[in-house]
Regions:
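Transmembrane alpha-helix signature in integral membrane proteins
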Residues: 2-34, 38
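Glycine-rich helix-loop "coupling/hinge" segments at transmembrane-helix boundaries
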Residues: 77, 151-189, 208-210
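Membrane-cytosol interface at the C-terminal ends of specific transmembrane alpha-helices
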Residues: 74-77, 81-132, 138-147, 198-201
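Alpha-helical membrane-protein architecture signal
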Residues: 4, 8, 48-55, 59, ...
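Generic hydrophobic transmembrane alpha-helix motif, especially the helices
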Residues: 44-91
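C-terminal transmembrane helix and the adjacent membrane-cytosol boundary/short C-terminal tail
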Residues: 142, 183-210
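Transmembrane alpha-helix boundary and packing residues in multipass membrane permease domains
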Residues: 26, 30, 72-77, 86, ...
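Short amphipathic alpha-helical coupling elements at transmembrane boundaries
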Residues: 5, 9, 53-64, 104-119, ...
């Protein structure tokens, strides 16, 4: 029962981390695309957009350059141990990874639909929401689900520094040589990984279908 409860905590940590990273990226990945600021997609070149490009790109680089374990050590220094520090650490690192991937999706978009909208008299706002986001959103969702698969595997790593879930219990059981408990934790961990992989694959198929 304890292992099942810890598995639920681990799953909750991974979902929370992926959701936080996904929402943050969804709000910031457009300024990180170079072709939006320089007018390649049909909009007018903007100096403000160029400044935002370098600022957001630097944020992506910083957050993904620091490993999840280091983020967890820093956050636990300020917060009490639990799944929230682990989710924040995983979310920060994956924010940088997912943000870079999503920005590159926009940079590789076909510019013809947005240029056609601009030629038809669309505003910048209409061009973004009718020409860019509909093209980028399916690939963004696919990348976010891929990162969820990575996050569920990394929860054990941040758990080693008391960030909650199966990782913390795994470290304690290993320290006291309770190998039967270690085997049980690994069993539940494998169930989580396989379950998340299958669910993520199904959701990715839905995203591609849409």
């Amino acid at each position: 029962r304890n292992a099942l409860s810890l598995s639920v905590e681990t799953l909750a940590m991974s979902v929370l981390a992926t959701a936080m990273a996904g929402v943050a990226v969804l709000l910031t990945f457009l300024p990180a695309a170079r072709n939006l600021g320089n007018g390649e997609l049909g909009g007018a070149p903007s100096r403000l957009w160029t400044v935002l490009y370098y600022l957001v790109r630097a944020t992506f680089t910083l957050t993904r350059a620091i490993p999840e374990l280091v983020w967890a050590l820093i956050i636990i220094f300020f917060l009490s141990p639990g799944i929230l520090p682990g989710a924040l650490a995983l979310g920060l690192h994956n924010y940088g990874v997912l943000g870079k991937l999503s920005a590159e999706v926009v940079e590789n978009l076909d510019p013809r639909p947005t240029r056609a909208l601009r030629a038809a008299g669309s505003s910048n706002f209409q061009m973004l929401f009718y020409g860019i986001i509909p093209q980028a959103l399916p690939q963004f969702l696919t990348y976010m689900l891929y990162r969820w698969e990575v996050v569920i595997r990394t929860t054990v790593v941040v758990g080693f520094v008391s960030a909650g879930g199966l990782g913390r219990e795994f470290r304690l059981s290993l320290s006291f040589f309770h190998y039967s408990e270690v085997a049980l934790i690994i069993f539940w961990y494998l169930i989580l990984v396989v379950g998340v992989d299958l669910l993520s694959a199904w959701l990715r198929r839905l995203a591609r279908f849409d």
